[in-house]
Amino acid sequence: MKLSNFQILIFSILFLLLPSCNPNYDLAGFLNGTSPEVCKRFEQSIAYNDSVGVPAVIVPSADYRVYVCTDSHIDSIPTNLTAFVQAAAADTLCPLALHLGDLVNAQGHIPYAVSLLPPNHSPLTTFLALGNHDIYFNQWDEWRSYFGSSVYWFYTMLPDSTVLDRFICLDSAEGTIGTAQLQWLRELLTGNGSQPSTLNAQHSSFRHTIVFTHTHFFRRDHSQQHTSNYAIEETYELTSLLEQGGVDMYWCGHDHSREITDYAGFTSIVVDALEDHYPPAFYMVATLSDQINYHFIQFP
């Protein structure tokens, strides 16, 4: 069906009026991305990492728990995120929690969402991945002012300095990690490249390696028709690299619906959305010991 000029005009007017009807609609970002692209965010993140070093999280024992959530989409209702933080903080075997992206829903809510997280120097250390909603409305600089980096890694160790597990966070907020970040990951996992081959490059030094980010590899669920995953070529490159690098698990969000896939020697888990008005909402609790076990907890 061919549209008339009048119909095109009406659709154009409605398209331009959408931001006034829905503040979550980022027209400027849709037409021309306002936050820096992944290559620039990667560059800024690595510069920050170089200034602070690699974090080490002290865990209470060789068997410890990690609480994992994603897609809280905070705007005004913080019930589920608050309950998640409280549950993790109350668990004496949980030294760290992960948020897999889309901390906020739209513009202006990052400071409020940050106020819901454990404060710095809390016994519960929180690490975040960057989601697509977190960079809408040119929010990257604000997000970076709180969290510093969207691409980083850290490791856990016992009080006697015995190194245990490695966690690697990737920036996939645009549905790609880009060539520079891919090379960084390759060097980190395989030691093939220019990075110093100290603790960071030898996966045999670690009991487990977990990669976490926002974007998923696989999606059989179609409840979120608009969500996208990586291009097929990037999926092939990344999954092959994770297999070569001895990665145990890949944790992500974005699709809002749980999906668990064993592929190429690792387990990929899409964690359910945490947001309040998206029932049923869940978070994941992973227990790391000689094996990695996990279960999901549903909010009432």
What is each residue range found by the language model?
Residues 1-20, 115-123, 161, 190-206:
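Short, basic, low-complexity termini and linkers enriched in Ser/Thr/Gly/Pro
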Residues 21-111:
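N-terminal active-site segment of His-dependent metallophosphoesterases
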Residues 24-47, 258-300:
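Binuclear metal-dependent phosphoesterase catalytic core
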Residues 43-55, 79-86, 110-115, 138-154, ...:
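Alpha-helical scaffolding within the catalytic cores
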Residues 61-76, 91-175, 208, 217-219, ...:
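Active-site neighborhood of divalent metal-dependent phosphoester/pyrophosphate hydrolases
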Residues 77-78, 178, 278:
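Alpha-helix N-cap/helix-start motif
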Residues 86-96, 162, 166, 175-268, ...:
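His/acidic metal-ligating clusters that form di-metal
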Residues 122-124, 150, 197, 244-245, ...:
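Structured helix-beta-strand junction loops
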